[in-house]
């Protein structure tokens, strides 16, 4: 114990969720690691995820500039090993480092894109709309766009930038938290630089506080150059992307395209088939635990829910009175999920990916 502030905090880590110490905090056995149920071993999952390794991005840059012979990933921002790889994943990644033998493009990539970037090991830039923590807290501890504290702790200055909005963890992660990394701008592979969006801070002006919520959401959610369906900006990111997609599933995937599996057809089905569903029969089903932790939707044994192509139960999308109802994981709002089957959709059997749906269902800003 000490009365001096600096002495009292000696040896403490401001963010115990940072990957440098997470094995001694969140990842202790019996907490988020060491379980017989692999879905609860979040330490292994997230440290091997693409958000931690950026394996595909590193491979693309090195291949483009001739530093490796193919697009196979050999390096990650952090090194990692998967003792039980799948046929489409890799067994290990070496840590990416710039050496005297590295190409100048690799050094530029590390300096301009990886350092101070959007990856779980790197602290965020101290700029509006980019504040966040590292490690697990990058997603599970929410920050305001202006980086100011709004909680009830009297010891935290309310005018000091860089604090989370509140000192608490959550699984109800809004799109605005995801936007502190995603949708911030565009990379130039040619120039090895990152160009921030011109329509939002820190380049553009702050959006007016009087802007209606839906208009503000659409403005912030996606970049002007993109095409997106209405459900993609009406819902939050976690309403579509599953835990395994966002946090990893314990395997070292080579790139986002190979890892990502949620498609429009997962929830909306096709012209010939409705979405796949399954009943919750096991009281220990991981979907029940996720619902309890989230708190914005109820789920129980006997409920019928949508299932992904990998067998992952989507507890927030439930069969109710002959309809599929989706419950928002951030606010609990209810949405009726429209089905392709029985509609006037012109979908072709060989065109089932989401990119084909965007051709007709894109929403113009």
Q: Where do the protein language model's features map onto the residues?
A:
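Extended surface/linker regions that mediate inter-domain or inter-protein docking
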Residues: 2-261, 266-355, 359-364
């Amino acid at each position: 114990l000490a009365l001096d502030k600096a002495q009292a905090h000696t040896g403490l880590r401001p963010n115990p969720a940072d990957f440098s110490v997470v094995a001694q905090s969140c990842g202790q056995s019996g907490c988020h690691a060491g379980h017989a149920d692999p879905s609860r071993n979040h330490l292994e999952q997230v440290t091997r995820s693409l958000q931690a390794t950026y394996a595909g991005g590193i491979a693309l840059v090195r291949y483009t500039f001739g530093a490796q012979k193919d697009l196979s990933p050999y390096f990650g921002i952090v090194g990692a090993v998967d003792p039980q790889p799948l046929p489409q994943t890799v067994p290990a990644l070496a840590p990416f480092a710039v050496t005297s033998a590295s190409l100048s493009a690799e050094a530029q990539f590390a300096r301009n894109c990886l350092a101070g970037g959007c990856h779980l090991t790197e602290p965020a830039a101290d700029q509006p709309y980019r504040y966040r923590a590292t490690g697990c807290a990058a997603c599970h501890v929410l920050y305001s766009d202006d980086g100011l504290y709004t909680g009830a702790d009297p010891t935290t200055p309310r005018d000091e930038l860089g604090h989370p909005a509140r000192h608490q963890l959550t699984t109800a992660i809004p799109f605005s938290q995801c936007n502190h990394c995603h949708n911030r701008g565009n990379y130039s592979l040619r120039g090895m630089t990152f160009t921030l969006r011109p329509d939002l801070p820190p380049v553009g002006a702050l959006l007016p506080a009087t802007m209606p919520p839906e208009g503000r959401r659409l403005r912030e959610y996606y970049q002007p150059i993109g095409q997106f369906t209405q459900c993609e900006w009406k819902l939050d990111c976690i309403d579509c992307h599953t835990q395994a997609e966002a946090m990893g599933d314990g395997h070292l995937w080579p790139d986002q395209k190979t890892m990502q599996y949620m498609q429009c057809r997962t929830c909306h089905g096709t012209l010939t088939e409705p979405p796949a569903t399954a009943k919750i029969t096991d009281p220990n089903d991981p979907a029940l635990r996720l619902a309890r932790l989230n708190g914005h939707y109820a789920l129980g044994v006997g409920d019928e829910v949508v299932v992904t192509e990998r067998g992952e139960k989507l507890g927030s999308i439930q069969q109710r009175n002959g309809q599929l109802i989706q419950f928002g994981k951030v606010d609990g709002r209810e949405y009726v999920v429209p089905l392709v089957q029985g509609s006037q959709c012109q979908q072709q059997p060989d065109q089932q990916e989401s990119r084909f749906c965007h051709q007709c269902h894109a929403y113009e800003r």
